[in-house]
């Protein structure tokens, strides 16, 4: 299974999963259809599945147009998002699996950004498609969920193997790390990562994927139990530390 990263809109990433052996493909969070259709034509591949992480338009906006071209493609999403994902045919629950290219992805229920957010974790290849729950250096805003839910979701993700590749849905990394430095500025891993990311963005290069290990070391929203973040917020309870950090980032 090859993962192809397709930039879209201002800062979205769409992920096309390609199986060259069968000339089939699946797409994760198609914000728009055009780049997906172009890449499918280039590859000579048929779209067989659409994996949506949540219902926001910049993650499902291409569903209908893709289904017009590939009407047999199955559309996966959370059962909580029933009626909110265009063309949805499969309603998923936590712990279920989906298959592509002979590999199984476990469905992780990770609410907080939205109440029905899910992630797809391919353990064999070590690939996590986490939508807007976990970002490189940050996390999603709480539009529908609670801090308690988001901490539970992020804790679930930070326990995945350190080498797991984090394919998040937006190129927000540089700004996320600028904020991180305001609350964890003495962290040498964070300082080094910021320099690397700044250099990548100067050339227009993507900073995604990261890894779970990198996020654990440098992402303040996975470090609520670290003394530096507790000191920055003046709090110790994990949920309260997270909520304070999220509020600070919202105003950054």
UniProtKB/Swiss-Prot annotation:
InterPro entries: Clx_II_MBL, Glyoxalase_II_hydrolase, HAGH_C, Hydroxyacylglutathione_Hdrlase, Metallo-B-lactamas, RibonucZ/Hydroxyglut_hydro. Its EC number is 3.1.2.6. GO terms for molecular function: hydroxyacylglutathione hydrolase activity; metal ion binding. Binds 2 Zn(2+) ions per subunit. Zn(2+) 1 binds at residues 54, 56, 113, 132. It is an enzyme of class 3 (hydrolase). One of its GO terms (biological process) is methylglyoxal catabolic process to D-lactate via S-lactoyl-glutathione. Zn(2+) 2 binds at residues 58-59, 132, 170. HAMAP family: Glyoxalase_2. Belongs to the metallo-beta-lactamase superfamily. Glyoxalase II family. This is Hydroxyacylglutathione hydrolase. The lineage of its organism: Bacteria, Bacillati, Cyanobacteriota, Cyanophyceae, Synechococcales.
């Amino acid at each position: 299974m090859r993962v192809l990263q397709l930039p879209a809109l201002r800062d979205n990433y769409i992920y096309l999963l390609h199986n060259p052996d069968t000339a089939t493909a699946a797409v994760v969070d198609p914000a728009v259809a055009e780049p997906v259709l172009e890449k499918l034509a280039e590859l000579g591949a048929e779209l067989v599945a659409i994996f949506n992480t949540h219902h926001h338009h910049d993650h499902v906006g291409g569903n209908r147009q893709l289904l017009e071209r590939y009407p047999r493609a199955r559309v996966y999403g959370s059962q909580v998002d029933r009626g909110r994902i265009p063309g949805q045919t499969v309603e998923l629950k936590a712990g279920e699996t989906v298959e592509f290219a002979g590999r199984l992805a476990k469905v992780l229920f990770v609410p907080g950004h939205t109440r029905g957010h899910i992630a797809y974790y391919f353990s064999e290849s070590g690939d996590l498609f986490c939508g807007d729950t976990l970002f490189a250096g940050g996390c999603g805003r709480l539009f529908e969920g609670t801090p308690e839910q988001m901490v539970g979701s992020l804790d679930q993700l930070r326990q995945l193997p350190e080498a797991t590749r984090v394919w998040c849905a937006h190129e927000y990394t540089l700004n996320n790390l600028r904020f991180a430095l305001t609350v964890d500025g003495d962290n040498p891993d964070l300082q080094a990562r910021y320099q690397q990311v700044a250099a990548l963005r100067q050339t227009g290069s993507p900073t995604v994927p990261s890894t779970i290990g990198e996020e654990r070391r440098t992402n303040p929203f996975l470090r609520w139990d670290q003394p530096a973040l507790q000191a920055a917020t003046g709090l110790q309870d994990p949920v309260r530390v997270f909520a304070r950090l999220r509020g600070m980032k919202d105003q950054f």
